[in-house]
Regions:
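C-terminal motif of bacterial Sec signal peptides marking the signal peptidase cleavage site
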Residues: 12-15
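Sec-dependent signal peptide recognition
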Residues: 2-7
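A sequence/structural signal for flexible, mid-protein segments enriched
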Residues: 17-259
Length: 259
């Protein structure tokens, strides 16, 4: 009797199988805008085209994805400057392109300033794109930075970085942090943005994990630093729209499953 039940259950399980084929449509290429402006620094804009999810990534494909000969304008409300296209080596024999200040038109050029809003206009392939951002005033600024033995790790050379800072009273401040180790690049943390919903008006003492390169496979000790490292900590005050973008992007990056 038990054998018969087992056979019936096995047959039932196999009968539930069904092959499903998804007919994924090719999405049209869209313009991807990566624009930055910081206090005391010139604006930079990188324009690329998206490519198919199934594309085989190589240097040539990346080079061909850059959008060239676009008209790119940035304004601080007083001056409007047309950015110039520049080429720089991506890998040996392959060039990448960005737009930044035109040294031939310095009368309208400017760098980022605190408490200033900016608008960006891009004209490419007969289409116009517009966006706006703001560099806020400095709000919370770190009081001190120090290192402690990394928790739950026996290696005494591994260190965790802590930051003590005071958040001014009044909701509406947003932050992003990046770290640079020795002569490396500035890299954002896995959760690089946060707001003042919890820390408003308080002094907090929090661990800030090392920034990560999302092109590399994850490492068990990637949150920590090594004894002897030179660490540069970049603590940014950002506006709400910038916070919302990075918060959404990082949440999607860490989520498992379909977008």
């Amino acid at each position: 009797m038990n054998k018969l039940i087992y056979i019936l259950l096995t047959a039932l399980l196999f009968s539930c199988e069904k092959n499903i084929d998804f007919n994924l449509k090719e999405s049209p290429n869209v313009l991807v805008v990566d624009a930055e402006i910081e206090n005391g620094k010139a604006p930079t804009v990188v324009l690329t085209r998206s490519f198919s999810y199934y594309s085989q990534i190589n240097a040539q494909l990346l080079s061909e994805s850059f959008v060239r000969n676009a008209d790119v304008y940035i304004s601080n409300g007083t001056l409007t400057h047309k950015l110039k296209e520049y080429a720089y080596p991506l890998v040996p024999g392959v060039l990448a392109y960005l737009y930044s200040i035109d040294s031939a038109s310095l009368s309208t050029a400017f760098v980022g300033e605190l408490n200033t809003g900016y608008t960006l206009k891009i004209i490419s392939d007969g289409k116009e794109y517009n966006s706006a951002a703001r560099i806020p005033e400095l709000a919370g600024v770190p009081d001190s930075i120090y290192f402690k033995q990394a928790p739950f790790i026996a290696d005494t050379n591994k260190k965790a970085m802590f930051v003590k800072a005071t958040e001014p009273a009044g909701l509406g401040n947003f932050y992003r942090y990046l770290t640079k180790v020795n002569n490396g690049l500035f890299l954002p943390g896995e959760n690089s943005v946060f707001n003042d919903q919890v820390i408003d008006g308080s002094t907090y003492d929090v661990q800030f994990p090392q920034g990560i390169n999302r092109n590399d496979p994850p490492k068990a000790d990637s949150n920590f630093y090594n004894r002897g490292d030179t660490v540069t900590f970049k603590y940014c005050n950002i506006d709400k729209s910038t916070y919302t973008f990075w918060n959404t992007w990082e949440f999607a990056y860490q989520s498992i499953g379909n977008p």
